[in-house]
Design a protein with these regions (language model features):
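Class I Rossmann-like S-adenosyl-L-methionine
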Residues: 1-216
Length: 216
């Protein structure tokens, strides 16, 4: 029997599909979660969060990596670039994952994928970032570059908005886009009750389930 594939290997595979093969993120993620049915809820949640978070914050993540690496992300081998990106996302946005574990797993994955010669590079970059993350400063100029990095939105898009709206309005738009919005579920009351849906969602690990403020 083959050894079950590990979470970070799946994350790497998904992100390579998205960034290298141009497969839509939601489709690549869905395929993996459907294929590996043996994954438990915690593993599926971890894969989903790291995958979606890395994609959502990729511009910011690349900026952070480029502050500490002599080899810029654009010049890196795709596998190493993805390993660093997903690790930096965890370092910055997932406090519950120890920095040492993030670094060690990234090094292990680099070696497993045949990049033994770059494992020291991965280790050095990530441990430096882990120590100095709070020292990373956003670019001051031009404004479009700062907003692009801060909100991980392509700079050309920011420039387009700045040419049409005041700076304050653009910042509000970008901030709103980065907010986490609730997921709404519509159900057929003839087939299932609201209480049954709430119970099932909580069984599946959804921590907070609330009624819609307007709809019944």
């Amino acid at each position: 029997m083959n050894k079950p594939i590990e979470e970070r290997e799946l994350i790497l595979a998904i992100l390579l599909e998205v960034t290298r093969d141009k497969v839509p993120g939601h489709l690549a993620l869905s395929r993996v979660l459907s294929k590996y049915q043996y994954l438990d809820k915690r593993e599926r949640a971890f894969i989903t969060r790291v995958t979606e978070g890395t994609l959502e914050h990729m511009i910011e993540i690349d900026y952070i990596i480029d502050q500490f690496s002599k080899t810029k992300t654009a010049k890196m081998k795709p596998v190493i670039r993805i390993i660093l990106r997903s690790a930096v996302y965890q370092l910055k946005y997932m406090d519950q994952v120890p920095a040492s574990a993030v670094c060690n797993e990234a090094v292990r994955l680099a070696k497993k994928r045949g990049f033994q010669n770059l494992s020291g590079f991965v280790n050095g970059v990530l441990r430096t970032i882990a120590r100095q993350m709070d020292q990373v400063k956003l670019p001051e100029h031009p404004l479009s570059r700062r907003l692009s990095v801060q909100y991980s939105i392509p700079e050309w898009m920011v420039e387009t908005w700045l040419s049409s709206y005041p700076e304050e309005t653009v910042e509000k738009m970008l901030s709103f886009m980065m907010e986490e919005h609730p997921t709404c579920i519509r159900f057929d009351p003839e087939r299932i009750t609201k209480e049954e849906i709430k119970a099932r969602l909580k069984e599946d690990g959804v921590e907070k389930v609330e009624d819609h403020p307007v709809l019944p």
